[in-house]
Amino acid sequence: MTAPADKGKKAKTDADGGAAEENEQIDGALVLSIEKLQEIQDELEKVNEEASDKVLEVEQKYSEIRRPVYLRRSDIIQTIPDFWLTAFLSHPLLSELLTEEDQKMFKYLESVDVDDSKDVKSGYSITLTFSENPYFEDKELTKTYAFADDGTTTINATCIKWKEGMEIANGNAKKKGSKRPLVEESFFTWFTDTEHKSLADGVQDEVAEIIKEDLWPNPLKYFNNEAEELGEDDDEEGSDADEGEEDEEEEN
């Protein structure tokens, strides 16, 4: 009488064994697919690395071609009074960094120069050149950025040699016209805060990025206030569109 029960147990055991074997086959196939996928991703990574190297080669080539053009541009800019002061003040972000005292100093700013390292991926420098002025001894204020393979950025900046009585303590200037002077941060803290500093991977110097990637390529558009004018045109177009929609609604 126990035979049917034994057969049932055997059938269940066989079924469990079959399911386990099937699961092993599925797991094996999944592992194999993932391994093949990883191989393809590794291959893509190599292609991407090659592409990055090629892009850097092209960028290096054209950086060298652009250099003499930038120098010619700089010569012309120096014939235009207050060019860089006007360009900075017209920039929506950089203008916020210039105090009234900074603006007086910027009237002596002759040139701004952004120069990539010979190997463009290893860093760049930003140099502000000033004419003789009553504020500091330096002819040039330079900030350099060196990119390491581990992703860190090392920053060095000119230690400003202020003339007697002209130093802005800690890079801060006091606002005038207030019983209790308000302290506003000077643009020149950009130099004093990072005379020797390292930034971790992914951390950027926002001011340097704006100067290098936005202002430097075409400062003329800010000198001419083109950026502001474009924004005004967009606002006007938006207003015209809104008025058109209102007219259509009234007609309906």
From Swiss-Prot:
Residues in coiled coil: 26-67
Entry note about domains: The acidic domain is probably involved in the interaction with histones.
Source species: Oryza sativa subsp. indica
Disulfide bonds: none
Protein name as it appears in the record: NAP1-related protein 2
UniProt main location, coarse: nucleus
Keyword Signal recorded: no
Record-stated family: Belongs to the nucleosome assembly protein (NAP) family.
InterPro entries according to UniProt: NAP-like_sf, NAP_family
Gene Ontology annotations of biological process type: double-strand break repair via homologous recombination; nucleosome assembly
Compartment(s) of residence: Nucleus; Cytoplasm
Purpose: Acts as a histone H2A/H2B chaperone in nucleosome assembly.
Gene Ontology MF term list: histone binding
GO cellular component labels: cytoplasm; nucleus
Record's compositionally biased regions (Acidic residues): 226-252
SUPFAM superfamilies in alphabetical order: NAP-like
Keywords: Chaperone, Coiled coil, Cytoplasm, Nucleus
Domain of life: Eukaryota
Amino acid composition bias (Basic and acidic residues), ranges on this chain: 1-15
Segments of this protein annotated with the region Disordered: 1-23, 222-252
One Pfam family recorded for the sequence: NAP
